[in-house]
Amino acid sequence: DVVLAIGNPFGVFGNTVTMGIVSALGRTQLSDSNPFESFIQTDAAINQGNSGGALINTNGDLIGINSSIFTRTGDFSGIGFAIPSALAKPIMEQLIATGEVKRGYIGVNLGSVTPDIAQRLALKDAKGAFVGAVLDGAPGSRAGLRVNDVIVEINGKATNDRTDAVNTIAMTGPEQTIPLKVVRQGELVELKVTLGKRPQIKRQ
């Protein structure tokens, strides 16, 4: 799909439009400090000053918010990223309504299911979110989640990997009770978890 990136490159040139295509969806692992990732990748030029600008399609629909680039030199090299509007909109609405962002939290350490994990746990597919640790007293612990469980569905939505799980939980508000489906020792187990509020990350 053809997309247009709108921004003010380098804070010098004023409103500028660049054109490119959507190169990929659901990009992750761009930052160690941000667990909530599912970026749109585009080759539309995004330079300093473009962050926060709109990424639109040829119909004028907002599809994302320009966010960052991947570069080894500091210059744009054809790999830019935007936050999907579906993720940005609820955050915007929370900030307008309350002045803060409240994310759901279950207090477990999650990882994606690799082929090695799938083989070790006798899973049919290398899909789902692997529970590596459960914090005592956290919502996940109270719901009955255990180490080595594999979460395959959250609130009726299939969970393909860690990113799916983290984003779905975070975008679901605290104090909501939602169903989980997990694979435990080859058996499908259904649980219900009441989400807590994710603690704020203290930046150094």
Predicted feature locations:
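Short, surface-exposed secondary-structure boundary micro-motifs
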Residues: 2, 8-9, 68, 156-157, ...
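Active-site loop architecture of trypsin-fold serine endopeptidases
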Residues: 6-20, 26-52, 57-99, 103, ...
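C-terminal recognition in membrane/secretory proteostasis and scaffolding
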Residues: 57-58, 62, 87-204
